[in-house]
């Protein structure tokens, strides 16, 4: 039987189940330019409305993996574990856990992207380090993974190229918010990345893509199933993003804070999430070791320094600092009971730390430092946050975005746990 895009669209439009052959054909034909953009847009909208069965979704994800190369990481001499975060405000966990897990005997290959809107991108953060580069050849990537044990690089076009085309189309057709499509987008790249195991960190709350636990849990279960079906050991942690993670939000500010954790210090909340993620990553590849001592004794810091140097960076070079700062103060005395992650992330973006469009440049020094954290007692007029920017008008925009981010009350409230659930 000859397959056509119209037949595939009609089947899903009417609530039918696509065959593996139909799924493989339509994604291969779309990637090869034989299915028109408007036809794929129609199919994506049908998927949003009708969903995909577990079998369909497994076939869809497999076809996305098959659209490109699958990395061979078998020559590293170590068990290989990858990590993915759904993104949040102040989420610099990858900067800590990649060298930390590598210091304990695993190999950590991390292909990362750039930030858009209020959430930062790992590449943007690392590019605040003088000389650091993320564009590595396949040979450079693999050599560093073997020699150092950890590498964070820019994702190229070779892995799951169908996903890159589909995501661009979803972005302009209102078909981004679909759990099957989100799950297949993430997992196709992770499966193609070639790791033995993957730890997923799905953020939940005001500053996250998934605002509620039920949706996050559904996404987590879907991704774990896709990874397992593909032979990749997969576990997901649901972690809170109601408040920013750590105190620094912005590229250079987050690198500095990650280095504090690697020195054995840093904010308690960031340290807690990093250790929880690292424990799961190690367990996935059969390494039964507590990661905390590797932060205290400098082993993780040593791998960080080697990782940065291997990619042209100088770990001891001063990070960029903002030309202008402004302190935001408390209007009343009391306990900090809420810090709105979305408002803080938006403030950092407007200060210059993020971008509205993919082609925008970022200011590596811009961002927000939270001087008062959840549960802290503050006096009226005491500092809550410091805004960092390159231009005065940026400070005004950041100040406006941050207005109302802090709730201060007479009595403290119990803080919610940072690690909400484990799936897998």
Task: Outline where the language-model segments fall.
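Short beta-strand segments
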Residues: 111, 145, 153-155, 186, ...
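Acidic, glycine/proline-rich low-complexity segments that act as flexible tails and inter-domain linkers
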Residues: 1-90, 306-307, 419, 424
């Amino acid at each position: 039987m000859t397959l056509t895009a119209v037949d595939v669209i009609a089947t899903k439009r009417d609530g039918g189940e696509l065959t593996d052959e139909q799924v493989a054909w339509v994604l291969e034909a779309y990637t090869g330019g034989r299915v028109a953009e408007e036809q794929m847009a129609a199919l994506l909208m049908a998927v949003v409305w009708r969903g995909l069965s577990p079998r369909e979704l497994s076939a869809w994800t497999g076809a996305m993996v098959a659209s490109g190369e699958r990395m061979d990481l078998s020559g590293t001499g170590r068990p290989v574990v990858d990590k993915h975060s759904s993104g949040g405000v102040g989420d610099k966990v990858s900067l800590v856990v990649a060298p930390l897990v590598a210091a304990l005997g695993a190999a950590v290959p991390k292909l990362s992207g750039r930030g858009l809107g209020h959430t930062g991108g790992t590449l943007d953060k690392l590019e605040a380090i003088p000389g650091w580069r993320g564009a590595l050849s396949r040979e450079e990537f693999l050599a560093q993974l073997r020699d150092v044990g950890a590498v964070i690089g820019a994702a190229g076009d070779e892995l799951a190229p169908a996903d890159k085309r589909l995501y661009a189309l979803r972005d302009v057709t209102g078909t981004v918010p679909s759990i099957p499509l989100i799950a297949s987008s993430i997992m196709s790249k992770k499966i193609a990345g070639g790791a033995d195991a993957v730890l997923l960190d799905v953020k939940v709350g005001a500053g996250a893509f998934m605002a509620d636990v039920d949706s996050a849990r559904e996404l987590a279960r879907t991704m774990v199933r896709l990874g397992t079906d593909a032979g990749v050991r997969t576990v997901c942690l649901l972690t809170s993003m109601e408040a920013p993670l750590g105190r620094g939000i912005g590229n250079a500010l987050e690198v500095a804070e990650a280095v504090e954790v690697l020195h054995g210090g840093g904010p308690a909340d960031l340290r807690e999430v990093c250790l929880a993620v690292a424990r799961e990553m190690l367990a996935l590849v059969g390494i039964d070791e507590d990661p905390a001592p590797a932060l205290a004794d400098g082993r993780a810091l040593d791998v960080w320094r080697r990782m940065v140097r291997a990619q042209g960076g100088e770990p001891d070079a001063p990070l960029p600092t903002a030309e202008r700062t402004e302190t935001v103060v408390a209007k009343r005395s009391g306990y900090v009971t809420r810090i709105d992650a979305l408002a803080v992330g938006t403030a950092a973006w407007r200060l210059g730390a993020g971008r509205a469009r993919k082609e925008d440049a970022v200011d590596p020094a811009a961002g927000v430092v939270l001087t008062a954290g959840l549960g802290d007692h503050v006096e009226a007029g005491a500092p809550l946050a410091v805004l960092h920017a390159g231009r005065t008008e940026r400070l005004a925009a950041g100040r406006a975005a941050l207005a109302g981010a802090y709730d201060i009350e007479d009595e403290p409230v119990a803080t919610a746990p940072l690690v909400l659930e484990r799936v897998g």
